[in-house]
């Protein structure tokens, strides 16, 4: 080889990109539809088969067949937008063109949101105004809309972010100007359907502990009669959400404090009680009589409480009447969708809309799905196919049979598959005793059919075990472990020894016997011993499912019995110096960046560990974690490291914006170029098993690809 050829080869090695794999299958999504909080559905007036929807943690989505199937649009976001969490809060379709949309999106006070436009049906988007406070996944995201379009002039829009003031939009959302009313937390803003130039804005009181930056907000119910140029405060107390009927007088229906419905027949100047016939609200969040969703037809109103009870009141009726539901059809489950959303029908309902073309056609969104009825509420069916909005924590494959998978998620615990992810089972009886999310899964490498999961929230934090190949689950005796409590002593990481019947657990809380630290079991989880001598008192192991990176392993165990863990607060790594007595010592590796370390043990090379953190902080150890050598082949922040336990040398790095795969133990990497074409977050967190990639998205399920 001449010198030029050698130089090209060296450059390729240094870049870590050697070219694609010889054969790759296409990415496939786990076929589980539903499972996240759907906020609203918008239907095109010019093309009624075109629908848009959005979820609190992802979206938007588009349907071209009236909700029978959907496709995601949020894969077009940049790395920065994904990192900031551009979750839609409200969306408006141009009534003249179904491909022309405007929407507002964002996530938190610190990571500000944007106003977006798309003129090609969501294939591409542009941020026309940046750095506004929209909370698509924030407080009161279920109330009202924060973007509306003038029914008399579709080129004019209005929006109301938190604290930034109201903004008036012109030229179909291309230009915006501030119209005042800063320092308010708005929950709803709408044009009057009958009076040109009239707009209503709702800014109810905000619980200080729930407001984004804990600062106080002004309150009030406002009306503008000059298209948003000036505003009049009609009263200090504001409804959370309003809807307007087209009956005589165009009355407004409002939700107050989630427990009372009132009506205004004078354009919001005064409000009268309108809750006759409704039950008194319980104290729980999910209860009869607590409302978040109302709808308006031409001459009637609808209301759905958080327990999923639907009520109707015709204009002129003396009271509300319960809509008798005769059947709920989970269409996706009956055709392979795997999630029984019917059992949660209407839970925390966020919206209910009446189709103006057919007022017997209602569309409701709730915690898990989209529902529609064509007979005014007697029979309902889901419309959620191809929307997988599950927040995914982890995936694990059975070491004895790669077709057996366990998929840990937020809120609805976990799913199991026996055909490699082609279909899944989700039976609540399987996980009796655990609620919330499963953050960690460990299969025994010695005993076939034995698996462990951990996670949960509030009073259900625990460890469950299956000894019959995922058929049934039960809590082991757990002798020797402290009382497991969410936010105190909790377990969110389990790890199995690849060569022995040993399982390790990281327990949060102060590191001392009977409290926090690393525990080890040699009898499949029935008894545990404290295994944490030498670890500092404050290891800061995850104490809740939403702790930063709680789903990433906090301990890694090698085939020689070595182990590495890390302090979540100081970023210091520790190695197991005495494998019999459980004595730990500090490694020579301590990260200084704000991100948490990730660690993994090579299942084939004893003592070989990989560790990563922020950009250019990739390192490896060959002595069980005692010393690490820093490498410079990975310029991105590393979000996950996963060795393939069935193929020596294969390892996947999930990085910020890149997915890298190595076939030489992590020395060089190839980039899976199409990973960023998938919807999801900025992280490419990935599990590698049997040359299969399981890409765990932030809130769009899991995608798989086979490498050959």
Where are the regions that the model predicts?
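Extracellular glycan-interacting surfaces
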Residues: 14, 20-708
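Bacterial N-terminal signal peptides that target proteins for export
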Residues: 1-9
């Amino acid at each position: 080889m001449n010198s030029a050829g050698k130089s090209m080869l060296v450059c390729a090695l240094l870049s870590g990109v050697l070219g694609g794999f010889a054969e790759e299958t296409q990415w496939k999504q786990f076929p589980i539809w539903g499972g996240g909080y759907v906020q609203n559905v918008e239907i095109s007036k010019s093309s009624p088969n075109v629908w848009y929807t959005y979820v609190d943690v992802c979206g938007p989505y588009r349907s071209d067949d009236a909700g029978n199937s959907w496709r995601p649009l949020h894969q077009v976001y940049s790395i920065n937008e994904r990192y900031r969490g551009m979750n839609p809060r409200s969306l408006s379709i141009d009534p003249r063109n179904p491909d022309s949309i405007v929407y507002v999106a964002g996530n938190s006070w610190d990571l500000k949101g944007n106003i977006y436009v798309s003129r090609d049906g969501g294939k591409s988007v542009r941020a026309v105004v940046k750095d506004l406070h929209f909370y698509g996944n924030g407080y009161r995201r279920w109330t009202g809309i924060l973007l509306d379009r003038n029914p008399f002039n579709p080129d004019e829009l209005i929006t109301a972010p938190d604290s930034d003031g109201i903004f008036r939009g012109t030229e179909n959302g291309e230009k915006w100007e501030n119209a005042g009313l800063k320092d308010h937390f708005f929950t709803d803003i709408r044009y009057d359907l009958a009076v040109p130039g009239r707009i209503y804005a709702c800014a109810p009181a905000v619980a200080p502990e729930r407001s984004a930056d804990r600062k106080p907000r002004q309150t009030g119910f406002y009306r503008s009669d000059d298209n948003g140029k000036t505003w009049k405060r009609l009263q200090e107390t504001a409804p959370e959400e309003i809807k307007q009927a087209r009956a005589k007088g165009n009355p407004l229906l409002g939700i107050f404090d989630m427990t009372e419905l009132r009506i205004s027949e004078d354009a919001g100047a005064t409000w009268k009680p309108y809750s006759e016939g409704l039950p008194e609200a319980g104290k729980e969040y999910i209860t009869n009589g607590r409302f978040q969703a109302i709808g308006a037809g031409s001459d009637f109103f609808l209301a759905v409480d958080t327990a999923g009870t639907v009520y109707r009141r015709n204009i002129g009726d003396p009271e509300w009447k319960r809509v008798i539901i005769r059947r709920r059809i989970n269409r996706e489950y009956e055709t392979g969708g795997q999630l029984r959303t019917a059992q949660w029908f209407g839970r925390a309902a966020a919206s209910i809309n009446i189709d103006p073309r057919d007022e017997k056609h209602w569309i409701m969104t709730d915690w898990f799905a989209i529902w529609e009825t064509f007979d005014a509420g007697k029979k309902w069916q889901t419309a959620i196919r191809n929307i997988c909005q599950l927040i995914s924590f982890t995936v694990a494959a059975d070491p004895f049979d790669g077709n057996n998978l366990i998929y840990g998620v937020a809120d609805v615990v976990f799913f199991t598959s026996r055909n490699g992810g082609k279909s899944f089972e989700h039976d609540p009886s399987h996980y009796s005793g655990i609620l919330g999310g499963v953050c960690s899964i460990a299969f025994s490498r010695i005993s076939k059919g034995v698996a462990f999961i951990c996670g949960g929230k509030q009073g259900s934090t625990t460890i469950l075990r299956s000894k019959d190949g995922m058929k049934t689950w039960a809590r082991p005796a757990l002798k020797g472990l402290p009382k497991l409590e969410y936010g105190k002593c909790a377990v969110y990481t389990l790890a199995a020894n690849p060569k022995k019947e040993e399982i390790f657990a990281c327990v949060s809380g102060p590191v001392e016997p009977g409290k926090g630290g690393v525990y080890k079991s040699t009898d499949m989880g029935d008894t545990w011993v404290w295994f944490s001598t030498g670890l500092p008192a404050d290891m800061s192991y995850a104490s809740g499912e939403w702790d930063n990176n709680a789903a990433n392993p906090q301990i890694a165990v090698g085939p020689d019995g070595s182990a590495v863990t890390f302090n979540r607060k100081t970023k210091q790594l520790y190695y197991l110096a005495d494998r019999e007595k459980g004595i730990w010592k500090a490694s020579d590796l301590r990260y200084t960046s704000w991100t948490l370390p990730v660690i993994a043990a090579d299942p084939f090379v004893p003592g070989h560990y990989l560790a990563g953190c922020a950009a250019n902080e990739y390192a490896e150890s060959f002595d069980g974690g005692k010393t690490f050598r820093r490498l410079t082949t990975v310029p991105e922040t590393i979000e996950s490291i996963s060795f393939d336990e069935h193929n020596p040398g294969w390892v996947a790095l999930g990085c910020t914006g890149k997915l890298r795969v190595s076939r030489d133990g992590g020395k060089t990497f190839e980039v899976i170029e199409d990973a960023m074409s998938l919807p999801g977050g900025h992280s490419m967190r990935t599990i590698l098993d049997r040359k299969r990639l399981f890409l765990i998205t932030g809130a769009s399920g899991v995608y798989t690809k086979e490498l050959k």
